C-alpha cells in the first residue's frame, strides 16, 4: 500500500490543495501557515477519536458553510501480491474495490454544514472509481475504516504520565495467565498484606485511624471504622508502577524528569503499542514538531529512527528542525506556503545511489535551505566565507528575511535545484566558468562551467574544444592562457549567458577570484601585500580567503555587494539597491 495523493477542499485555511504523497512525508513551512491543519485533515479522515466530534463552523474555509468540506485520499494498491498491508485493506473493503481500476483506491470525506444543528456531519465513502464511491459501512462512530487503520497522533507536548496510565492496563494484562508469573504474583500479594499489617501497627497510623473514625461517627451514626491501606493492596501492584531510568553499571534509579528524556520514552511506548496492541492494523504516525524539548543530538537520533526503522512505515511529520531531516531518503517533502492563498508544493526526495556515501552531507546542507524563501547555491567554503562577511556588513538580517547560502560541495547543483524548484523555493546560482582537460586527449577541454549551467536548464552539453598551448608554457603562464580563452568563450556564448541570468544563474567570466579582483582589486593587493592577489589567493584558496575576509573593511563589503559581478547577492536579499 502506498499513499499517493490527498485533495483538501474548504477546510480551515485550505481553499483547495492537491498534494502528492508517499509513505514517509515531511511537512514544513512558516508558523501558522497550515501544517497542523494538514495533519488534522488526515485525522478527520482516518481517526475516529477526532471524527466523532464532527465539524464546527470555524472548520470551514473562511467560515463559508455554503460549500462542503471535502478530503479525498488516494492509495496505490498495485503491490497487492507482495504487501501485507495492502492485503489487510483489501480484505476489509471487499466489494468497494472493483477489478476495472483495482490498483487505485479512494477514501473520501465530505461534510455539509447544518445551520439548524450548528454542526457539520461527516459522511465517509470509498471505492476504486472516484465518481462512483460507496458509503463506508459502520455503526455509530465506528466504521470499517477503523478496523484497518490506526492513527497514532503524537502531540509536540506529549504527556508521558497520561500515555503510560492510559495504556497500563493493556500492557500488564498481557502477563495475566502467564504461568511463570503466577507464583511471583502470589508472593507479591502476600508481601503486600504484610506491608499493610505493619502499616496498621504503627502508632501514628493507629492514632489517626481512631480519631478520624470518631470524627466520622460524630457526623454519621454508622458502625464503620476508617483504616489506612496501601493502594497496592486494593488496586493491585501494577497501579503503583511508573517508569524510571537506570544507567548501565549504576545501581541507582533516576526519575524521567527531563522533558527530552520523557519525550523519547513516550515515543518508545508508542512504538511498543504499534507492535503489540495494533499489530493487526495499518499504523499511521502523525507526528507534530517533535523537536520541541529535544536536544540537537536527540533530534538527529530520532531522524535515524524515523527514516530507517520499519516501525515508522507510514508517517506524516511536521517540523521546523533541519536536524530531523539528516537521514531522509525516499521521502515526500511537502512545503506549505502562502502568497494570496495557502498552497502546497511537494517533491519526492531520493538520494541517488551514486551519492549514497555522502547522503548525510547532502541532506545536512539541504535541510536548512528548505526553510528559506530564497537560496543562493555556491560551490564551496571560500565563497561561503566571503559572502557571509559581505552580507553581515551590508544586509545582516538576510536570513531573518528568508535568505540562505547553500554550499553544494563542488558540483552537486542538480541534486539541490530539482528539490528547491519543485518546492517553489527561489534558487540563485553562482558558479565558475571552469574548463576541464580530457584525460588522454592533449589540448582538449570540456566546457565544464557552461555545461553545468546548460544542464540546469535541461540542455545538452556543448562540444569539447581544443586549446593549443605549447608544452614549454606551464604553471602561471598556462593559467593566464586558459583564462584568456575563458573570456573568449564567455563572449562567444553571450546569448546563453543572457539566458542564464534570466534563470538566476550567474556564471563568472573566469572565476570567483577574478570577479573579486574586479570589485576590490586594490584592497586585495593591500591586504595580501602582493601585486598579483588573484594568484596569491588561488595558491591556498580557503586559507587565504580567511585572511582576506578578516581584513575587509565595510567599504570593501559594499563595493563587492554593489558590483555587477556579484549581482547574485542582491538577488538573494531581494535588494533594489542601485
From Swiss-Prot:
Q: What is known of its domains?
A: The N-terminal ATPase-like domain seems to have lost ATPase activity, but may still bind nucleotides. The C-terminal Toprim (topoisomerase/primase) domain probably has the endonuclease activity, but when expressed alone (residues 348-578) has not activity, showing it requires the N-terminal ATPase-like domain for function.
Record-linked Pfam families: AAA_15 (PF13175), OLD-like_TOPRIM (PF20469)
Residues bound to ATP are: 32-36
The record lists a divalent metal cation 2 as bound by 383, 513
Q: What is the documented function of this protein?
A: Component of antiviral defense system Gabija type I, composed of GajA and GajB. Has no detected ATPase activity. Expression of Gabija type I in B.subtilis (strain BEST7003) confers resistance to phages phi105, phi29, rho14, SpBeta and SBSphiC. Expression of Gabija type I in E.coli B (strain ATCC 11303) confers resistance to phage T7.
Subunit info here reads:
Homotetramer. Forms the core of the anti-phage defense complex. Interacts with GajB; 2 GajB dimers dock at opposite sides of the GajA complex to form a 4:4 GajA-GajB assembly (GajAB). GajAB interacts with Bacillus phage Phi3T Gad1 protein; this interaction forms a 4:4:8 GajAB-Gad1 complex and leads to GajAB inhibition.
Signal sequence coordinates: none
Identification of the protein by name: Endonuclease GajA
The gene from which this protein is expressed is: gajA
Stretches the record annotates as ATPase domain: 1-341
> Which UniProt keywords are present, listed alphabetically?
Antiviral defense, Endonuclease, Host-virus interaction, Hydrolase, Magnesium, Metal-binding, Nuclease
What residues does the record give for site: Interaction with GajB? Answer: 94, 97
| Annotated stretches, region: Toprim domain | 370-510
- InterPro entries, from UniProt? AAA_GajA/Old/RecF-like (IPR041685), Bact_Antivir_Def_Nuclease (IPR051396), P-loop_NTPase (IPR027417), TOPRIM_OLD (IPR034139)
What does this protein need as cofactor?
Mg(2+); Mn(2+)
How does the annotated pH dependence read? Optimum pH is 9.0.
Q: Which residues bind a divalent metal cation 1?
A: 379, 463-464
